[in-house]
């Protein structure tokens, strides 16, 4: 199921990995999770397309959820209404005990190195292939880095001018991460010829001072032709998450850190539930409590704002915070309003984070994270990110 050239070039990434005292096969895990979640992913993507193609007026198409709309709870297996979820947020903020009350990260505490308040600051992202990009990321004084398997690591092509012998960046970056975390580059230089000159790179920062790493997988819509299950391309989200967990959990755990992800392009609670199932299944496979893998979510889709309380609720065992950003959010607003003859499209070149609409966006994000992140009168269970 792994394309032969990928398997031959990166054999370390596949086959049986020893994780938390268990032997787990990478390909079998990708296949099992793909078979389980592929129908749900297809349904979620169909729902996206139906919204975009809907003939309903924009204001109706993107209306707030009904109070009696129900959502599946991955924790209890019961259904909650949107009213229950929002009331539970309010009860939590007010410190009021009730059956509806809920908050973030109540089961597995947030590690200090992943906590958005204990370890705040600049969050950098970029590809981890070529290797010097990964070295530069780890030598950075920034507190957090996202090895990027989304925007910066295209799986289907090599950029113009790339020699034919160069590997597919996704898998090369994954191999680089595995080797670095296992200490294979601690005392070794990486030498590469650039513009006719040999350049040498080293990791100069001790591992204890490296930025916290949050792997950024692709969105639900991306398929990997290099990994197939039952003759069909596997979802990139599943492939990357499985490869990252099974190849890196041991080394990250030994280093005193953990498995963390930055999730892009999330739009609805339906999509959040797919992610929660994926992560919970993997936690069960390696024998750690549900909620051990922590995540941040990029709130970069305007439609996600309608569902933000429910998205946070579905992910409450592991969500550290939701991140606001400008470029993708404005693009999503254009997509939402494209069919409205009265629509006014934002100009990303001129609208900054201090514009009134963007201030409202940031305040709303902060409000939801404040309501969900409070415990004993303090914001300890999560926090808004960015803005």
State where each predicted segment sits:
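Glycine-rich loop at the start of a catalytic domain that most often binds anionic cofactors/ligands
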Residues: 58-82, 139-141, 158-177
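Conserved alpha/beta-domain cores
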Residues: 2-12, 18-20, 25, 71, ...
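Low-complexity, highly charged intrinsically disordered N-terminal segments
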Residues: 19-99
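N-terminal active-site wall of soluble small-molecule enzyme domains
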Residues: 77, 84, 98-110, 116, ...
